[in-house]
């Protein structure tokens, strides 16, 4: 029996994995070090996708000579190798080793018998150790004990050296989108300045500006993380988590803004009903908690030995379901707004069409990523698609709300200093909040100024207030305004 499979070498520790030609899934770290002490005979260390002719593994392993002998196994991502042995409880060590083809140099024996493994015996405080320079999986008769340090690289370029093959291009993509979103944010601030001068800077537009600003911060932290990662192969996981939280926050702010606009807030009405406020609060709380659960699930339960996409989890599928529910709500809100205010069709028709695509883009992307994109290319492709979806959403809204006379889709036509009119008296002398309102006047009875964001009153209905202005005759049904001057024509930029 060949030395590697001698009875004395009963335990093996496979992982380091992925090989030269098969470009496997993803890896978390390109510089890995630590101490391993386990009773298990098969322990996963890390995962990395090497490029043919460029991929290189530099390592240092040390373990007590009494634990001899241990091996490092390099698995291809071929279905007959890594997927066939990982978490295969019905296979023992020899069975897991048997799928490897020795002629491909996939086994590194960490003993002095193999000079190319770089092993030598050293003594330290009376204990003899085997110190080697090359490796990845090990065997012993009573568990594993190992100090390890590995540097996994793809070429010498700053943009590829520490990156797994499935991560190529992520840093360049993030930098590109960061510059684009900075431009969008500054344009939104400029448009906001113009709108504020015309008293048309409404809460929903401020939410758009906030979403764009948070998106910029998110991409900035992603670039910092990947830039540091490209430098040292380690990165700062806290920075990446912060970037993900900001990315999710931007998405949630934008989603809330879309639902509010669909319901006509700041376009056809100045307030959301009490029932609508409660529904929005419950929905957004549920959506936020699900996002948090998804991040925790990804950090704590994703198996680094497998390639798992963010949405490939119960929390991820829950988010997809909430996205579909949000679209149904969005459709209903837009249809109701159009039914009561058909004069708003120039805004709502393209608005509905554009964001129908956006609502479906996220779940469709998740399904394609889970089932249609090769694992070794998934992370970089999904990153680009996800950022493209966010860019589409922000770019469309920026164009639709640009304050230009040529913009026929401009949604805002009531000043922030105006209060809404009283409607035509309904049965019993009550006033209707939904019917017979003049064009470009809000649907609810009261509209507060939002020159400064007032999030505490965003969705609530204020108590009736006595107006200091003279009131019209009870049966006149004429609207009352604090400022009766129209906003005036929009100027081209």
Curated annotation (Swiss-Prot):
Give one GO biological process term.
Answer: G protein-coupled receptor signaling pathway
Q: Where is it found, in Gene Ontology cellular component terms?
A: membrane
What are the record keywords, sorted? Glycoprotein, Membrane, Transmembrane, Transmembrane helix
TM region positions:
9-29, 175-195, 207-227, 241-261, 282-302, 318-338, 349-369, 381-401
Q: Where is this region: Disordered?
A: 464-493
**Which cellular compartments is it found in?**
Membrane
Q: Which InterPro entries match?
A: GPR180-like_N, GPR180/TMEM145, GPR180/TMEM145_TM
Task: Provide the residues annotated with a glycan attachment (glycosylation).
Answer: 35, 444
Q: Which domain of life is it from?
A: Eukaryota
Main localisation, per the record?
membrane
Task: Give the membrane topology, semicolon-separated if more than one.
Answer: Multi-pass membrane protein
- Provide the protein name: Transmembrane protein 145
Its source organism is Homo sapiens
What gene is behind this protein? TMEM145
């Amino acid at each position: 029996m060949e030395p590697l499979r001698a009875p004395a070498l009963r335990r093996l520790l496979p992982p380091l994995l992925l090989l030269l030609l098969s470009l496997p899934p993803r890896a978390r770290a390109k510089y890995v070090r630590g101490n391993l002490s386990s009773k298990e005979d098969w322990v996963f260390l890390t995962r990395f996708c090497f490029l043919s002719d460029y991929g290189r593994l530099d390592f240092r392993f040390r373990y007590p000579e009494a634990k001899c002998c241990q091996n490092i196994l390099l698995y291809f991502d071929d279905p007959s190798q890594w997927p066939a042995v990982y978490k295969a409880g019905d296979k023992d060590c020899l069975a897991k080793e048997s799928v490897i083809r020795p002629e491909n140099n996939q086994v590194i024996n960490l003993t002095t018998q193999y000079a190319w493994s770089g092993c030598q015996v050293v003594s330290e405080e009376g204990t003899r150790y085997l110190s080697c320079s090359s490796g990845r999986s090990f065997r012993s008769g009573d568990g594993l004990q190992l100090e390890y340090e590995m540097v996994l690289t793809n070429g010498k370029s700053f943009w590829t050296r520490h990156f797994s093959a499935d991560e190529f291009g992520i840093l360049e993509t993030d930098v590109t989108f960061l510059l684009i979103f900075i431009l969008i944010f500054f344009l939104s601030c400029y448009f906001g300045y113009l709108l504020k001068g015309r008293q048309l800077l409404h809460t929903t537009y401020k939410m758009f500006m906030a979403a764009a600003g948070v998106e910029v911060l998110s991409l900035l932290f992603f670039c910092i993380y990947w830039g540091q990662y490209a430098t040292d192969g380690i990165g700062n996981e806290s920075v990446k988590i912060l970037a993900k939280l900001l990315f999710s926050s931007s998405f949630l702010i934008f989603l809330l803004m879309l639902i509010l606009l669909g319901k006509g807030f700041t376009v056809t009405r100045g307030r959301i009903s009490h029932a609508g406020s409660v529904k929005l609060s419950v929905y957004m709380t549920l959506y936020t908690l699900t996002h948090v659960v998804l991040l925790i699930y990804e950090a704590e339960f994703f198996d680094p030995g497998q390639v798992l996409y963010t949405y490939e989890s119960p929390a991820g599928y829950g988010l997809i379901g909430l996205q579909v529910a949000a679209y149904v709500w969005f459709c209903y809100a837009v249809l109701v707004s159009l039914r009561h205010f058909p004069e708003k069709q120039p805004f709502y028709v393209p608005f509905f069409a554009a964001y129908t695509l956006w609502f479906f883009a996220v779940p469709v992307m998740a399904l394609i990523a889970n089932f249609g994109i090769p694992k070794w290319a998934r992370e970089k492709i999904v990153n680009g698609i996800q950022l493209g979806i966010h860019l589409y959403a922000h770019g469309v809204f920026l164009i639709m709300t640009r304050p230009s006379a040529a913009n026929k889709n401009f949604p805002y036509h009531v000043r922030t200093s105006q209060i809404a009119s009283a409607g035509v008296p309904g049965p019993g002398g009550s006033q209707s909040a939904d019917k017979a309102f003049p064009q470009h006047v809000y649907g609810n009875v009261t509209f507060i100024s939002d020159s400064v964001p007032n999030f505490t009153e965003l969705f609530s209905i204020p108590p009736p207030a006595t107006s200091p202005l003279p009131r019209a005759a009870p049966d006149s049904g004429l609207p009352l305004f604090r400022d009766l001057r129209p906003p005036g024509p929009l100027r081209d930029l």
